[in-house]
């Protein structure tokens, strides 16, 4: 959530931020107008309270002078003023709730280092690692490789659950498990604390992390219990410390979790709906940091490098791009996308988004830290995929495929697999 005090003080800052993101600024006008009305109510309340205080002094004087009847008349008048104050304060509370609810729809202002652009075509590439493999045969897409191996079954997934669900068998199922274990092992060696989190969360939890109310249509819900299936472990990890005060000397806190993720993906279309790229249910290893404002953008660089390290160890070519203002996620102040090379697309495809959310989630969740000087400040939260398991599986299948349809297993995964090659199921 944005800082409403800052909006009151400098609405122009938010006008400019929303324009950079290609958002309508009407919501800022609504809040500014509500704030004017709130201030007007506040002035009325303050004047009434001042009048009531004067009457209280008058009552004391009349009683001291023995003028009890006059004192009772003033007390009656003071009571009426108290009722008026309660009415105006009730209106103030209603206005505060309206402003708060509107503010939930305002995205995080982009950081000054984020390039201004209208959409993903204006994202800025900042580095590459590795070279795409030059095949001496016609490579196959994973949606052909997997069924030919007898290990990816899209038809049975559809039969069980509908479109964009998949059943995995044999070595491919084991490889997906191995990828997750490998990622967790690397991240925990790098100082992350592994966390096993709930996959169902309360409405206030998923509101705190920014998915609600704006993205309600993208979420799977359990209406009877008012619970939501997590679209990412970020939700559970970034809400772990709701209503808590952390100590600065214990920051940063670095968490990692492996969970299934559930997304309706209502707006997806085209080539992405084939295979494993855009599923309703997929697995992911998530990275989340709690840190201080002074170091959060420096920490974002480290978090991104931690995600990149997985691809380097797997020997998968990738590039890193900075998202422009028009492509930035709702809660993010700055985001790096890591894109892995996929032969089936003949291009790079997102496998991780690493973001600094600044204090956007912390304000919603009331997550603060006590600084060394004793002051309480909101933490900054960072998040990133470390990595998406399904897309990593796809990248391995396509980049490590052989002419005979077998798949060579990357060296770092062989201890987890107990073999160096995946052959068709018998």
Curated annotation (Swiss-Prot):
L-serine binds at residues 232-234, 286, 385. Its EC number is 6.1.1.11. Signal peptide: none annotated. ATP binds at residues 263-265, 350-353. InterPro entries: aa-tRNA-synt_IIb (IPR002314), aa-tRNA-synth_II (IPR006195), aa-tRNA-synth_II/BPL/LPL (IPR045864), Ser-tRNA-ligase_type_1 (IPR002317), Ser-tRNA-synth_1_N (IPR015866), SerRS_1_N_sf (IPR042103), SerRS_core (IPR033729), tRNA-bd_arm (IPR010978). It is found in: Cytoplasm. Coiled coil: none annotated. Its main location: cytoplasm. It comes from the Bacteria. NCBIfam families: serS. Consists of two distinct domains, a catalytic core and a N-terminal extension that is involved in tRNA binding. Catalyzes the attachment of serine to tRNA(Ser). Is also able to aminoacylate tRNA(Sec) with serine, to form the misacylated tRNA L-seryl-tRNA(Sec), which will be further converted into selenocysteinyl-tRNA(Sec). This is Serine--tRNA ligase. It comes from Fervidobacterium nodosum (strain ATCC 35602 / DSM 5306 / Rt17-B1). The gene is serS.
């Amino acid at each position: 959530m944005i800082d409403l005090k800052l909006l009151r003080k400098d609405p122009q800052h938010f006008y400019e931020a929303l324009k950079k993101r290609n958002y309508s600024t009407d919501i800022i006008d609504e809040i500014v107008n509500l704030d004017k009305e709130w201030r007007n109510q506040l002035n009325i309340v303050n004047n009434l309270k001042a009048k009531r205080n004067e009457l209280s002094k008058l009552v004391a004087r009349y009683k001291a002078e023995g003028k009890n009847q006059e004192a009772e008349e003033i007390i009656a008048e003071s009571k009426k003023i108290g009722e008026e104050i309660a009415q105006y304060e009730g209106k103030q509370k209603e206005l505060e709730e309206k402003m708060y609810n509107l503010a939930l729809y305002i995205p995080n202002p982009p950081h000054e280092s984020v390039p201004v652009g209208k959409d993903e075509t204006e994202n800025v590439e900042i580095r590459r690692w590795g070279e795409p493999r030059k095949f001496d045969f016609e490579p196959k897409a994973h949606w052909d490789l997997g069924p030919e191996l007898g290990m990816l079954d899209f038809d049975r997934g559809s039969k069980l659950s509908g479109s964009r669900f998949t059943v995995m068998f044999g070595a491919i199922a084991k490889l997906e498990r191995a990828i997750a274990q490998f990622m967790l092992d690397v991240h925990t060696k790098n100082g992350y604390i592994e966390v096993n989190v709930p996959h169902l969360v309360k409405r206030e939890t998923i509101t705190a992390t920014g998915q609600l109310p704006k993205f309600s249509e993208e979420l799977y819900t359990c209406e009877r219990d008012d619970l939501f299936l997590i679209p990412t472990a970020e939700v559970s990890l970034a809400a772990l410390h709701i209503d808590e005060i952390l100590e600065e000397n214990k920051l940063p806190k670095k968490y990692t979790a492996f969970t299934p993720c559930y997304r309706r993906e209502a707006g997806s279309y085209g080539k992405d709906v084939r295979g494993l790229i855009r599923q309703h249910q997929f697995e992911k290893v998530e990275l989340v940091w709690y840190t201080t404002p002074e170091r959060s953008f420096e920490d974002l660089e480290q978090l991104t490098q931690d995600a990149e390290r997985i691809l380097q160890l797997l020997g998968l070519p990738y590039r890193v791009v900075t998202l422009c203002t028009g492509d930035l996620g709702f809660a993010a102040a700055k985001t790096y996308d890591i894109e892995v090379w996929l032969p089936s697309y003949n291009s790079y495809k997102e496998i991780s988004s690493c973001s600094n959310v600044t204090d956007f989630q912390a304000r919603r969740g009331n997550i603060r830290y006590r600084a060394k000087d004793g002051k309480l400040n909101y933490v900054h939260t960072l998040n990133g995929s470390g990595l998406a398991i399904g897309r990593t599986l796809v990248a391995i299948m396509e980049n490590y495929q052989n002419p005979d349809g077998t798949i060579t297993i990357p060296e770092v995964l062989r201890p987890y697999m107990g073999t160096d090659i995946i052959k068709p199921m018998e």
